[in-house]
Amino acid sequence: MAGGKGKSSGGKSSGGKTSGVEGPKKQQSHSARAGLQFPCGRVKRFLKQNTQNKMRVGAKAAVYVTAVLEYLTAEVLELAGNAAKDLKVKRITPRHLQLAIRGDEELDTLIRATIAFGGVLPHINRALLLKVEQKKKAKAQEA
C-alpha cells in the first residue's frame, strides 16, 4: 500500500541489521568504549560524591574528566621517565617527578603542590655565574 498505512510485511524484521543471527553483545565498560585506561565509573562516583545538593552527573562529563586525568598523568610520567633516563636509572622517584614538573612551564603553573622528597631545582644566579666566568677568563689570559 502506497500511503504507508497497511499491514507490515509479516514476520520479524531484522531492525536494520545486516545479519539476523547474532549472539548477545559483550558488555563494555565506559572506559573501554572511550578507549581509556582510567576508570570512568569510579570518576563518576567521585564526581557525584563531591557535588553539592545531590546534583546529577552526566556520563559524558565523567568520560571527559577521565580523559583529561589520563592525559595529564601520561604527560607527567613521560617527562619523569625522560628525567630518569637522563640520570641513567630505571625507577622513577619523586625527584624525577619534581624535575619533570618544574621543567615544564605549563605543568609548573598547573601543579603548584610541594612534592615530598622532590628536592629543589638547581639554580645559580646569573650575577654569580658572570663573576666565576670572568675569573676563569682572567686566569686563562695570565697563563
Swiss-Prot record:
It comes from the Eukaryota. The gene is hH2Az. InterPro entries: Histone-fold (IPR009072), Histone_H2A (IPR002119), Histone_H2A/H2B/H3 (IPR007125), Histone_H2A_C (IPR032454). It comes from Neurospora crassa (strain ATCC 24698 / 74-OR23-1A / CBS 708.71 / DSM 1257 / FGSC 987). Its main location: nucleus. This is Histone H2A.Z. Belongs to the histone H2A family. One of its GO terms (biological process) is nuclear-transcribed mRNA catabolic process, non-stop decay. One of its GO terms (molecular function) is protein heterodimerization activity. The lineage of its organism: Eukaryota, Fungi, Dikarya, Ascomycota, Pezizomycotina. The modification N6-acetyllysine is found at residues 5, 12. Residues 1-37 are annotated as: Disordered. GO terms for cellular component: euchromatin; nucleosome; nucleus.
